[in-house]
Amino acid sequence: MPKPKEYVLKKSEEIEGTKVEGPWLDDTKSLEEVVSLYTQIGFQATHLGKAIEIWRKIEEKREKGEEIRVFLGYTSNIVSSGLREIIAWLVKHRKVDVIVTTAGGVEEDFIKALKPFILGDWIVNDAELRKKGINRIGNIFVPNDRYIEFEKYMIPFFERILEIEREKGRPLTASEFIYELGRFMDEKLGKEKEKSIIYWAYRNEIPIFCPAITDGSIGDMLYFFKEERRDRELIIDIANDIVKLNNLAVTAKETASIILGGSLPKHAIINANLFRGGSDYAIYITTAVPWDGSLSGAPPSEGVSWGKIRAKADYVEIWADATLVFPILVWMVMKR
């Protein structure tokens, strides 16, 4: 005879742990106090709370003089958004040591120092936008004159790179190319360059790696430059950057991998850390899912299986739009 009550009201064991509880707003006086209680809320708030704790631990150790080399990776859409300025602040204040991004993460940073991107909408007539020469990145609009202006700067910059390569007798690596682009910004652009990632990376000698440097408008400009001039001299060396990036991981006492999004920057960083037995700390912020087997969706624990993150590493993954959580994360760590 079934005993419904025993099934429904099954006895449970007592468990120890953190009580799930949110902030009581009568007792909180600031948003900072609210966020400080995120670890107890549950779901992704708890993951954000843990990310704050991990990065604070990293910062506290660095402030004491301990060596933790911080690798920051992000995709181009991060720079398309207003997160660009937050990353530029981190670079200005030397809160990161190594950057890996995509071509868009380089060129859009430069373009924004010329003209801004404009807030639009998600639901629009894209065919009409095309007629008007307006490109769309989600709800961000990029008029095509931004790229026309970009070309005006890139052609003389390519000429400069050619001269440097002739003087050195070898191609520049992508990271050297980006360093020279920062120098070029310093010489040619005005006050707006002071919110640029590339500019501050140049000033503080923080390397920016971009293994897919031609996969964007820079590649378009290189195509026009080479075709119109029948140039075969200008070459960007990717191979030697692999040595430099990997050695930055190998020679570090400890490393931290902070990844916004997925794609190439994520793998370039964690694969470099494989050469030292894995990263000691990792913070992933992503909306990618793990069940399609993609690298973008692979959680930190999967990286442990490859040796790219250490088994005893302190890590967390936040499943959220980075534009929502990264500003909170940085503020809570750097402005506490």
Swiss-Prot record:
Citing just one GO molecular function, the answer is: deoxyhypusine synthase activity
Q: Does the keyword Transferase apply?
A: yes
Please indicate which superkingdom the organism of origin belongs to: Archaea
Q: Which SUPFAM superfamilies match?
A: DHS-like NAD/FAD-binding domain (SSF52467)
Enumerate the cofactors the protein uses: NAD(+)
GO CC terms in record: cytoplasm
Q: Which residues form the active site?
A: 308
What EC number(s) is this enzyme filed under?
Answer: 2.5.1.46
Name the top EC class.
Answer: transferase
Q: In which pathway does it act?
A: Protein modification; eIF5A hypusination
Per its record, the protein catalyses: [eIF5A protein]-L-lysine + spermidine = [eIF5A protein]-deoxyhypusine + propane-1,3-diamine
* Sorted UniProt keywords: Hypusine biosynthesis, NAD, Transferase
Q: What is this protein called?
A: Probable deoxyhypusine synthase
Q: Which gene encodes it?
A: dys
